[in-house]
């Protein structure tokens, strides 16, 4: 069995009617997918359901026992089960992380099937991550209504559905299209070269896995979104209206229940950066953070530092070791930056190596802007804090997120050169100064604050996200009476 057989069962229900079980299935080694899944599980428990989070069998990319144990300890209302370690199928190349995720999930299907068959009570619903899409076949085989939970934006799902249409219209790979614009219902035009790298080559295994997953979406009982309609109305309406699927293909119900963001851990010692922020004027600090995998070359770090120094603005910068230098000891910070940088900026800047409590930082009143890699969890945290963004996408779906954020939601402005070898110091300085000092930056801040208010209203009693969640929970609590509760009436 896996390292965590059945880590903890939910507390017994003392009423005469047993609680209905929902199983949420998340892939290994992807905290950005696991955290929202755990938050979804907690909300469902509050609605009277029993929830078990199943974690995909770990491989060399696995998150590790201490990480999983920490998640478990912080989520006492949930049960956890870790599938046995899966063996990578021989037809999956070792060089593609995304293909490995799809392949390992497929290889774990027999173990998932065994767990679902033995679960007591029998699950009323199976909720799966996009990378675990092959598990839909297991749910269908066992007669368990199966839903997808998407940890990306609604616009990404609209594109994913519409990819089947594009696939029918052309035999070219996205890579062949270069910067040609793709026109998808409900979305701004997307440059083909901004799509995730793993789907650019039509005949690659990762691209075939992705297309297969998009087809499975249409065969599910519903699509659960970590977003809300007020943030993405055109994409939401395009999906619900059936504009993103092939003619004759079913569009499953859409449940927009977000934004769900990971709460700050209770009881943790307050990070020193928050005390530093306490001493800064309101909305004066630019926060730069690029996710757990966001690394830059040594020269790019120097360009960023030079730009921040030239800008004259206050900043809090989370810096990771340069690309290729990740495993070296921390050493002297000065070696990473232009000569004198730390001394020259010590009165208005703070550099932190590795980690800060991002949500708490964004929620601090001193923070006036966020330079972000456009990971969706980070975007939602910024929206919920009302902090405007400068978009600097790095990998995966972040380039398309940038398009949606800048062109559609209008909650960010792009750092020019993000798609080139180097972003110059002058661009960093100009954009940071623009964000904090200009009328345009102030207008961007007002739009972000308006989006924050709309998102919070969606989560309140009677709000669209709250209503969608209640409808979803009601479906599962009323066993065998599956209705099509969509958020659009």
Predicted regions, residues:
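Glycosyltransferase specificity loop/lid
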Residues: 2-489
């Amino acid at each position: 069995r896996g390292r965590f057989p059945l880590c903890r069962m939910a507390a017994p229900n003392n009423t005469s009617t047993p609680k209905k079980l929902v199983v949420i299935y998340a892939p290994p080694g992807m905290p950005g997918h696991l955290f929202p899944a755990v938050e979804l599980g907690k909300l469902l428990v509050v609605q009277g359901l029993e929830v078990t989070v199943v974690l995909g069998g770990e491989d060399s990319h696995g998150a590790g026992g201490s990480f999983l144990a920490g998640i478990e300890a912080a989520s006492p209302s949930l049960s956890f089960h870790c599938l046995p370690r899966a063996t990578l199928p021989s037809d999956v190349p070792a060089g593609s992380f995304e293909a490995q995720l799809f392949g390992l999930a497929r290889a774990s299907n027999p173990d998932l099937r065994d767990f679902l068959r033995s679960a007591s009570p029998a699950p009323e619903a199976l909720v799966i991550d996009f990378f675990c899409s092959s598990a839909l076949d297991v749910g269908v085989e066992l007669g368990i209504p199966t839903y997808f939970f998407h940890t990306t934006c609604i616009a990404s799902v609209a594109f994913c559905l519409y990819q089947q249409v594009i696939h029918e219209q052309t035999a070219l790979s996205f890579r062949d299209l270069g910067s040609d614009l793709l026109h998808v219902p409900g979305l701004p035009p997307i440059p083909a070269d901004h799509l995730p790298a793993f789907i650019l080559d039509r005949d690659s295994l990762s691209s075939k896995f992705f297309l297969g997953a998009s087809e499975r979406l249409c065969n599910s009982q519903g699509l659960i979104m970590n977003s809300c309609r007020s943030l993405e109305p055109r994409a939401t309406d395009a999906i619900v209206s059936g504009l993103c699927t092939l003619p004759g293909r079913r569009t499953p119900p859409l449940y927009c229940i977000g934004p769900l963001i990971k709460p700050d851990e209770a009881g943790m010692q307050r990070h020193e950066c928050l005390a530093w922020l306490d001493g800064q004027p309101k909305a004066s600090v630019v926060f730069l953070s690029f996710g757990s995998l966001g690394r830059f070359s040594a020269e790019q770090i120097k360009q960023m530092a030079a730009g921040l120094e030239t800008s004259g603005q206050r900043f809090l910068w989370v810096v990771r070791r340069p690309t290729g230098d990740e495993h070296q000891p921390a050493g002297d910070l000065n070696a990473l930056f232009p000569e004198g940088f730390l001394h020259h900026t010590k009165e208005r800047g703070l550099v932190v190596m590795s980690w800060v409590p991002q949500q708490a930082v964004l929620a601090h009143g001193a923070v006036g802007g966020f330079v972000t890699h456009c990971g969706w969890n980070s975007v939602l945290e910024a929206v919920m804090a009302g902090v405007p963004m400068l978009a600097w996408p790095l990998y995966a779906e972040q380039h398309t997120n940038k398009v949606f954020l800048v062109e559609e939601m209008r909650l960010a402005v792009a750092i020019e050169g993000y798609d080139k070898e180097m972003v110059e110091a002058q661009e960093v300085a100009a954009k940071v100064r623009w964000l904090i000092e200009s009328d345009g930056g102030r207008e961007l801040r007002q739009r972000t604050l308006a989006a924050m208010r709309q998102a919070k209203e969606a989560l309140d009693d009677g709000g669209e996200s709250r209503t969608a969640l209640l409808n979803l929970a009601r479906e599962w609590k009323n066993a065998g009476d599956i209705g099509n509760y969509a958020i659009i009436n």
